Amino acid sequence: MSTTTQNIPWYRHLNRAQWRAFSAAWLGYLLDGFDFVLIALVLTEVQGEFGLTTVQAASLISAAFISRWFGGLMLGAMGDRYGRRLAMVTSIVLFSAGTLACGFAPGYITMFIARLVIGMGMAGEYGSSATYVIESWPKHLRNKASGFLISGFSVGAVVAAQVYSLVVPVWGWRALFFIGILPIIFALWLRKNIPEAEDWKEKHAGKAPVRTMVDILYRGEHRIANIVMTLAAATALWFCFAGNLQNAAIVAVLGLLCAAIFISFMVQSAGKRWPTGVMLMVVVLFAFLYSWPIQALLPTYLKTDLAYNPHTVANVLFFSGFGAAVGCCVGGFLGDWLGTRKAYVCSLLASQLLIIPVFAIGGANVWVLGLLLFFQQMLGQGIAGILPKLIGGYFDTDQRAAGLGFTYNVGALGGALAPIIGALIAQRLDLGTALASLSFSLTFVVILLIGLDMPSRVQRWLRPEALRTHDAIDGKPFSGAVPFGSAKNDLVKTKS
């Protein structure tokens, strides 16, 4: 950018169409967050009515993560083939329908299936909205685009907590899910009133449809084997998370089977760049493992361990959700200033100073707890707002929605494991200690994976001929693309 351009405030680099595109996607993601967290808010009520164990109740949160990988793949491919806008609308309709079904669920199995539908829609909304906004904004503002967008999910969680405190004590937990049908109206408006993403239009102008991940996996020469593997993965995940298996060894075997299937899909669809794709799934897996025990079980901790009433729970969750939302926006500024990976690492390191105090002070002072949660979530959870930008930079435009959707949502199975692991550890320790221990230890794994740019590093080790040296979204160098000790200018020389 020129000196004159740099002196212009960042928001003046955006035209009205770009702001409208962002606003529409942000509202869609807010509604996604609202619908998704409803189950966490009423988990104790649902557990009591259906007579569920703690692990079974936690599996209702996990259910939405089980189907996310498939939703991210299918709806991401839709976004790559037919445009980001159609994929966004379809995703909103899916998660809204699943939420309504939760309100009518007569028992555990029905609600579990409804949560599977929500997971598919949520996955599609994440991938399509993220690529839509990132590709609509200028390159030097794309960390902000990512961070601002993902803040909508946290705002949706805050709104849901406030609605919970007003609705559930009067009309019961089912009424909360009936409200979740409203996003369908918004989806109909989206279909007619927002433009297509600029990068996607430029890539596809006058060209034949791209060959998507769905084409490669389910219409190629290995389609029969891939369909069988898809069914096998779905069945294995069902048995792992539906509370039907008590044998840890069997669960481990099924988990390894799923991992092998997902790696196979990545090898087939990404070609020589499969090491990058696999490592991105690992990054996201640990990102969910460190953050989602708190996201999923914080309401339960507040209601059981701290004995807070619904109104106080809503107030504390407001601080938590608002902190995450602010953190997404702050992360966007940090990412454009420091660079995506450096901003991620610095924010997570700062969050580590707060995670132990959050669960050590108890519930005597609600305001102190709320403030600690605000800053911890701002630094620890909010920085995940730039994760779509980080992941998307490893994929070209014609594979970005499916690549982001699949890698992110396979890794998001960590979110399915997280509440169950937290609940299991809480059987031996108190819930607060379990949540703090998981988050504190696993955050360091994410710091290492992102700080060392392990996707690029492993790609260089295994398939260097397909190494990408620069971010496909903003053109900045990948630090892991050169060996330790190499000159920094090497990356500039190799930029295509």
Swiss-Prot record:
Inducing or repressing factors = Negatively regulated by the transcriptional repressor NanR. Induced by N-acetylneuraminate, via inactivation of NanR.
Task: Provide the membrane topology annotation.
Answer: Multi-pass membrane protein
Task: State the reactions this protein catalyses.
Answer: N-acetylneuraminate(in) + H(+)(in) = N-acetylneuraminate(out) + H(+)(out)
Pfam families under this entry? MFS_1
The record ties this protein, via InterPro entries, to: MFS, MFS_dom, MFS_trans_sf, SA_transporter
Xref: NCBIfam families: 2A0112, PRK03893.1
Say what the protein does. Catalyzes the proton-dependent transport of sialic acid. Can transport the common sialic acid N-acetylneuraminic acid (Neu5Ac) and the related sialic acids N-glycolylneuraminic acid (Neu5Gc) and 3-keto-3-deoxy-D-glycero-D-galactonononic acid (KDN). Functions as a bidirectional transporter in vitro.
User: What protein is this chain from?
Assistant: Sialic acid transporter NanT
Q: Which organism is it from?
A: Escherichia coli (strain K12)
